[in-house]
């Protein structure tokens, strides 16, 4: 049986976003979108994907985008794109918009791609991101093969990036019209949906694994960073709306450029449905309901854990001699989440 932690307060983990604001020092309390109704944490049951709080799907998004830039270069994925995303994104964070009762849709490769996300609760999201210096108003432009849009519309917030060599400044209006059709439809169909609570919402990194435990495995003193280089709408969704954390353990000596990277922990509360979409080699980890091992494109090693209805990813890095086996950290993480851990000082 999962134990609820004694303490659920912690410094907000800020997310690396290109062009984001300087990092503030918020201590946000994770909250659900205004359109979802919290319910008690359920007994573990078959994982079910969260319902979007509006009547727009990735099929609808693909239809609009096909009219702008042609058929998708690759099958449309109901997740955030990894084409140019930051290193923490692969895994749980790709599905953060669904956790917030929204959608995220992406397709393409490095030369031609698009990504669109829509999420309810626009007023609170804009207010929070503005307070934390990560939102300065609507964005909408096309130029030199790229279109970037970000705006609230009624009760929803839409973000989009489109890359195609044929796009130019003259396409701004028609792209805006297509995206507004999507946001208007979503805003007009907002409804309340069930929100599945989770014990790991707002949980500090030390409740997953402590610096001391990582040190004992890594063989040297480590520092814990929950801070990155900026804040934006994705940070607001991941950290505040979802209550997830980014926990990055690196050598105590050095800075962000020179330190040795050992472990990153990311999570998707009540994200077992997304865990089941992952591909990897099954691993037996005592206490976990399921575990999958896989590798990243740059030498990283992943271990995905399903614990009850939650998805936790452990990622290790190649520091020059190959990434360490993340299963070394798994017993501690699983024990802490299932049996409890002494509150960190």
Please identify what each model-predicted range represents.
Residues 1-10:
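Bacterial N-terminal signal peptides that target proteins for export
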Residues 15-19:
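C-terminal motif of bacterial Sec signal peptides marking the signal peptidase cleavage site
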Residues 71-139, 224-300, 307-308:
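Short, solvent-exposed recognition patches
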Residues 130-200, 280-345:
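A short, solvent-exposed beta-edge/loop patch
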């Amino acid at each position: 049986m999962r134990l609820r932690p004694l303490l659920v307060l912690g410094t907000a983990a800020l997310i690396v976003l290109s062009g984001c604001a300087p990092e503030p020092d918020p201590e946000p309390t994770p909250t659900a979108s205004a359109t979802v109704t919290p319910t008690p944490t359920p007994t573990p049951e078959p994982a079910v994907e969260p319902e979007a709080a509006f009547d727009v799907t990735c099929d609808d998004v693909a239809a609009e985008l096909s009219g702008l830039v042609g058929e998708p270069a690759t099958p449309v994925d109901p997740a955030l794109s990894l084409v140019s995303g930051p290193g923490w994104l692969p895994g749980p964070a790709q599905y953060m918009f669904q956790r917030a009762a929204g959608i995220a849709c992406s397709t393409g490769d490095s030369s031609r791609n698009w990504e669109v996300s829509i999420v309810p609760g626009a007023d609170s999201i804009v207010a929070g991101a503005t307070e934390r210096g990560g939102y300065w108003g609507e964005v909408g432009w096309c130029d030199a093969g790229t279109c970037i849009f970000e705006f609230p519309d009624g009760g929803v917030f839409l973000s989009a990036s489109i890359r195609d060599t044929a796009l130019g400044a003259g396409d701004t209006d028609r792209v805006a019209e297509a995206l507004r059709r999507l946001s208007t439809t979503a805003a007009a169909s907002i409804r309340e949906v069930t929100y599945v609570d989770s014990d790991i919402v707002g949980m500090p990194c030390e409740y997953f694994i402590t610096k001391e435990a990582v040190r004992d495995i890594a063989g040297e003193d480590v520092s814990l960073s929950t801070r990155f280089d900026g804040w934006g709408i994705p940070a607001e969704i991941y950290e505040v709306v979802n209550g997830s954390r980014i926990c990055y353990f690196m050598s105590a000596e050095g800075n962000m450029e020179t330190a040795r990277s050992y472990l990153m922990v990311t999570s998707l509360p009540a994200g077992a449905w997304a865990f089941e979409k992952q591909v990897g080699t099954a691993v037996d980890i005592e206490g976990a309901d399921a575990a999958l091992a896989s590798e990243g494109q740059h030498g990283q090693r992943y271990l995905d854990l399903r614990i009850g209805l939650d998805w936790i990813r452990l990622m290790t890095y190649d520091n020059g001699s190959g990434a360490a086996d993340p299963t070394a950290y798994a017993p501690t993480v699983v024990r802490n989440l299932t049996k409890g851990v002494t509150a960190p000082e």
